[in-house]
Each structure stands twice: as structure tokens, then as C-alpha cells.
Amino acid sequence: VKPISPETIVDIGCGPAAETTRLESYSQQYLGIDISREMLAQAQTLNPHLSWLQGHWTSLPLANESVDWVFANLSLQWVDDLNTAFAEVYRVLKPGGIATVNTLLPGTFSSLQNSWAEVDNKPHINNFSTLADITQATETFPWLHKTFYTHDYVQHFSNLRALLTSIKGVGASLVKRDNNSGLMTKSKFQTLENTYETYRISGGLPLEWHIVNIVLVKRG
């Protein structure tokens, strides 16, 4: 879903410009926003002709009603204050503007989470907001149109290392580090690997994704 001929697109949580080429082709002005200076530096190197700003979902460095299209691919799951995040989206959108956002729901990486539970009792997977929490956070403002549709799918990998690498490829690791010991130890990895093998099916090791796609249209 995308608006017709948007003048300005803002990519929240742009990371190292994974979506930039596609989004830039849709608009006259593309603006990437990310909280990480390192990610922005990579994006700037790849696309020096575009604009990049450091910022966060809950405090967008943008003027009121200045954006035609707010786009965000797998960045909302890092936000604790959903109410403020959607208030910011509403604030920066022009009348008639559209926001297309996707994020992860509980149940994502369930096999990985269950396997980690056999290694230790520390959190290794983000706590994802429920669909009810997300929909409620959008109710503060009188959107012209709201759509929430979910999509579930399972990837399969030949081994655990490939599976974990694929998660890091999202832009920032969705798996939290062990804060006490830093990088994973060899023994922990072996335990995790052995446990995860019990989930193997004919296609390989499963990695579950539960995604909600959100479309919000501001009244004109």
C-alpha cells in the first residue's frame, strides 16, 4: 500500500538504507531517520545525495504536517511508548497523508525463545506488543482510515548459525544479548543448538514470524 505520488516520504528506522532505493523511486523527497549514528553513516555513504536525520519514533525531528507518507519496516517493535509514537506520526503527516507500518507480534521466534529457556532464565527475545495494545495506541486521533492485517509465516534454515545470522540481517539484532557474559559462550551455543534441533522438521530449523501490517490515513 502506498499513496499516489507522494512528495515527501519519511522512513523511520531506516537502518543502512535497506528500503531506500525502492522508496526514493516513489517520491520527490526521501528522508531517512534512525536512532543509530552508525546506521545513518552507512546509509549516507551509500546514498550521499539523500537526507538523513538522527531521531526516534517518539520524538521525530520533523515539522508539523510536513510528510505525505510515513513508512516503517520492522522498527516499531523497539518502541515502549506506542501512544507517543503514533501521536508523532499523526503530528507530522499532512492532511490526507498515509502511514504504512509493520511490526512483530508475540509468538515471533517462539522456537528460539523456547530453546533459550533451556539454556538460562535470562531474556533473549524482545517482548513484542500485542495487537490489542497496538490498535489501542492508534485510537487517540480521528484517523480517516485504519487497517490492521496480520501475516504469519515460517522460514527454515539448515543450521542455527544461519538462522541467527538472518535475524541480525533485519538491521539490528532482534535477539537481546546476555548482559552479564556479553557474547554467547561455546557451551551456551551448544546447548541452544541441541535444544533447537528438537524443533527440526523436514524443511529445516523453523523461525516463526508473526507480523501486523498497519495502514493509517489522516483526514484531509
Feature-to-residue mapping (PLM):
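A short acidic, Gly/Pro-enriched loop at the edge of an enzyme's catalytic core
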Residues: T58-V70
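A short SAM/SAH-binding and catalytic strip from SAM-dependent methyltransferases
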Residues: W69-D81
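Class I SAM-dependent methyltransferase SAM/SAH-binding core
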Residues: T8-S59
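Conserved catalytic/acceptor-binding region of the Class I
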Residues: K94-L160, V170-S181
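A short glycine-rich, Lys/Arg-flanked "PGG" loop and its adjoining helix->strand segment in the class I
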Residues: N83-P95
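Conserved Class I S-adenosyl-L-methionine
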Residues: T147-G220
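Conserved alpha-helix/loop element of class I SAM-dependent methyltransferases that forms part
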Residues: V1-E7
